[in-house]
Regions:
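Replace the tail clause
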Residues: 1-254, 258, 262-265, 297
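Long, K/E/R/D-enriched contiguous segments that form extended
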Residues: 247-319
Length: 319
């Protein structure tokens, strides 16, 4: 039958029934970000003014951003969480997750005007521009979960590492804010014993930390970001997870859309330039003379006939 309001209501009620009010997200572990559900709920809120829909989105976006599923040092979102609290992720990073999570945060910012969500957008687009963009302008597909044969090794930290890099005072601040434990909070996959390493994560926002200490939030965030920069510079020296450097037409369309929408909503010319360069790349390297698209490109070679999702998502990006 035809799609009508009752179908939208049914979808909303199903999501609300499955919502985790304590940790955000839907259902039990493993938990995926499912940003498309959040975008639906934002549209449902705009249509119905049902504040429950908006609160579900805000809670979920904040809890994900504060969790270990989010790369607190280098930004970007990992693929999913193996627990209910978003603490321990499967450390792989997928391009489409970045695009969809940007879209959900951007739309939430447009509804709420809360800069918390626009800052998340800026962080993820910074990550994609820095680590997931080819010199030609296309976006790479993914980064692996493991390096040196260990999942997450690139992303986890020992407490003494933080102390050596940041010094005693700054280390105390970082370890407290990001919930480090002396024995570690990252468990060995088979034995479930503590490994001595930590996944940085938050239990409350950086602004809430500042308020609790009677500090000005903007200055507090600036201080924390300076610590991130030191740790990021140190982390760059580690053996990096392997990058899947294929450029896929459909995922690039999603990312072009995320950059271009963010450019308009946040008035950021640099995001528009990134989107334009990626779009030009796709139309130059992934479009045949007869106008038909190809699905993938890697190291100068494009191939495979495109599918419907390639046309749909690249069209979305170009629009």
């Amino acid at each position: 039958g035809d799609l009508n309001a009752s179908h939208l209501d049914a979808c909303f009620h199903a999501l609300r029934e499955n919502f985790d009010p304590e940790h955000g997200g839907f259902g039990n572990r493993p938990k995926f970000p499912t940003a498309h559900n959040l975008s639906f709920l934002l549209r449902y809120y705009k249509r119905t003014e049902n504040t429950d829909a908006l609160e579900i989105v805000k809670t979920t976006l904040q809890k994900i951003h504060q969790g270990g599923i989010y790369d607190q040092v280098g930004f970007g979102i990992h693929r999913y969480s193996v627990d209910n609290e978003w603490l321990v992720p499967h450390f792989e990073k997928m391009l489409y997750d970045q695009a969809l999570f940007v879209q959900a945060n951007l739309e939430c910012f447009q509804v709420t005007k809360d800069p918390y969500f626009s800052r998340t957008v800026d962080e993820i687009l910074t990550y994609v521009s820095r680590d997931m963009t080819s010199p030609e302008g296309g976006f790479y597909s993914a980064e692996d979960a493991d390096s040196e044969g260990e999942e997450g090794k690139f992303y986890v930290w020992k407490q003494e590492e933080i102390e050596n890099i940041l010094g005693p005072n700054d280390a105390t601040l970082f370890l407290q804010v990001y919930r480090f434990e002396k024995d570690g909070n990252f468990l060995e996959e088979v034995t479930h014993e503590k490994t001595g390493t930590n996944i940085p994560h938050l239990r409350k926002s950086l602004d809430q930390h500042a308020h609790d200490k009677n500090q000005e939030p903007k200055e507090s965030r600036k201080k924390i970001r300076s610590l991130h920069a030191k740790l990021f510079a140190h982390r760059k020296k580690r053996i990096h997870p392997q990058k899947d450097d294929k450029v896929l037409t459909d995922w690039n369309g999603l990312m072009i859309s995320a950059f271009s929408q963010s450019a308009k909503a946040l008035n950021q010319e640099k995001y528009l330039k990134t989107a334009q360069k990626a779009a030009d790349f796709c139309l130059s390297e992934l479009r045949q003379k007869n106008g038909r698209l190809l699905k993938r490109w890697r190291k100068g070679k494009a191939g495979l006939p495109a599918h419907l999702e390639d046309y749909a998502f690249l069209s979305q990006g170009l629009l």
